[in-house]
A protein has these predicted regions:
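Short alpha-helical elements
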Residues: 1-308
Length: 308
């Protein structure tokens, strides 16, 4: 089993990785938008109707749902993190995009189409990385505001189940107020699944969702996922082998298998890219739906760039 992992890691190094952003070669925002829209149309299939909208009652918008999704991905792909800056640049393409909606409408519809955006992302993942046997799991803190301002934060006031919380980040040795992003990726660096929880939720609780979505595979994590009871439960219920490094003072200590340590760097590299290129730690959202839509848009933009 470990021999197969070593071979996969060797092939992943030999493979030439494409540039994950085209803004250095393609400065035209409309050209990027048109290219991503064409890909979304090919992948969406039965998710939308002929006009590119999710079937629903009421007025049929001229600027389709697929165009909203593609515009969201295009803006994130070129590093435009502000809606104000995005619509300032879109004024140059009024002729190419005659049915362009207003900024307020775009903000509302981006939240509505976030589920469509995630469904398209999942289809791209299945086409790129559908037969993986090894996965990496990790979490990333998403800070909403400073702890001193947490009582004045209006995010999640209407629904406490979606409200942020106070958590501790061991890698940065700090407490923060916000959420925790849990993600599972393959050896090729494609994020298969992710979720947002309160910052106070322990990493090991996300394995309950992993047990439902995955089976007959190996999941590689860090020391935050150490639990003999959880390891046994995953193996007995879904035949998932959870591999985590031992603590230095742990009984029956064993050295970490080098291939597991190298494989775990995949998801750490992804989190670094999401922070630097896609600026995932920035927060302009005023409510939880807006924040969740931003996270989905950034991860979907990363996935479609990998797909290209």
């Amino acid at each position: 089993m470990f021999k197969k992992l070593c071979i996969l890691l060797i092939f992943s190094k030999l493979k030439v990785n494409k540039l994950l952003i085209d803004k250095y070669r393609m400065h035209n925002l409309y050209a990027i938008f048109a290219k991503l829209l064409n890909i979304c149309k090919q992948i969406a299939g039965n998710l939308v109707n002929e006009s590119g909208n999710v079937p629903r009652r009421g007025f049929v918008p001229k600027f389709s749902d697929l165009e909203v999704v593609a515009l969201n991905m295009a803006s994130e792909a070129v590093g435009i993190d502000s809606e104000s800056l995005l619509f300032a640049k879109l004024q140059e393409y009024r002729v190419e995009i005659p049915n362009l909606i207003s900024r307020r409408q775009y903000n509302d519809r981006r939240k509505i189409t976030s589920s469509l955006c995630n469904a398209i992302r999942e289809r791209m993942v299945s086409k790129m990385d559908g037969g993986e046997d090894y996965f990496c799991i990790d979490s990333k803190p998403i800070e909403v505001c400073r702890i001193a301002r947490s009582k004045r934060c209006s995010m999640g006031k209407k629904d406490f189940s979606k409200a942020p919380g106070v958590g501790y980040c061991a890698s940065q040795s700090m407490y923060y107020y916000g959420y925790k992003l849990h993600a599972v990726c393959g050896l090729s660096g494609v994020i298969h699944s992710f979720d947002l929880t309160k910052a106070s939720v322990h990493d090991i609780h996300y394995l309950k969702d992993v047990k439902v979505d995955y089976s007959n595979c190996t999941v590689i994590g860090d020391r935050g996922y150490i639990s003999a009871q959880v390891q046994l439960d995953l193996f007995e219920t879904a035949n998932i082998r959870l591999e985590v490094p031992y603590r230095c003072n742990q009984k029956e200590w064993k050295p970490t298998f080098p291939a597991f340590a190298k494989a775990r760097k995949r998801i750490e590299t992804l989190f670094s890219q999401l922070c630097d290129q896609f600026m995932i730690i920035r927060n302009y959202a005023k409510d939880t739906d807006g924040l969740f839509a931003r996270i989905i848009g950034k991860i979907s933009a990363l996935t479609i760039l990998q797909y290209i």
